From Swiss-Prot:
Catalyzes the pyruvoyl-dependent decarboxylation of aspartate to produce beta-alanine. It comes from the Bacteria. Heterooctamer of four alpha and four beta subunits. The gene is panD. Pfam families: Asp_decarbox (PF02261). Pathway: Cofactor biosynthesis; (R)-pantothenate biosynthesis; beta-alanine from L-aspartate: step 1/1. Substrate binds at residues 57, 73-75. Its cofactor is pyruvate. It comes from Cytophaga hutchinsonii (strain ATCC 33406 / DSM 1761 / CIP 103989 / NBRC 15051 / NCIMB 9469 / D465). The active site is at 25 (schiff-base intermediate with substrate), 58 (proton donor). This is Aspartate 1-decarboxylase. Belongs to the PanD family. The lineage of its organism: Bacteria, Pseudomonadati, Bacteroidota, Cytophagia, Cytophagales.
Length: 115
């Protein structure tokens, strides 16, 4: 039996941009992607701390070490610049394997930089 488990989490980053008329996605600083083990085009869940919204989209690689967190397309309506969000990726794995699984969690600073 396979179950979904937490794979990666970028905890409490600040939304730096919201681009409504861009094809949907979230643009994430490449340094944050690398540290969290999230790859381009991966499906992620976004949880907005400020308004309680939860939604899914996919990842676009942003310029490295810029701190960019940009919600694009319709997702831009679910955030405001300055909102704090959590980015979560999940993986499907065997139940027994999942018992031993350790997700990758990162906790960037207030400027979306690695600590």
């Amino acid at each position: 039996m396979n179950i979904e488990v937490l794979k990666s989490k970028i905890h409490r980053v600040k939304v730096t941009q919201a681009e409504l008329h861009y094809v949907g996605s979230i643009t994430i600083d490449e340094a944050l992607m690398e540290a969290s083990n999230i790859i381009e085009n991966e499906k992620v869940q976004i949880v907005n701390i400020n308004n309680g919204e939860r939604f899914e989209t996919y990842v676009i690689k942003g310029e490295k070490n810029t701190g960019v967190i940009c919600l694009n397309g319709p997702a831009a309506r679910k955030v405001a610049v300055g909102d704090i969000v959590i980015v979560i990726a999940y993986a499907s794995m065997d139940f027994e394997e999942a018992k031993k699984w350790k997700p990758t969690l990162i906790f960037p600073d207030a400027n979306n930089r690695l600590i």
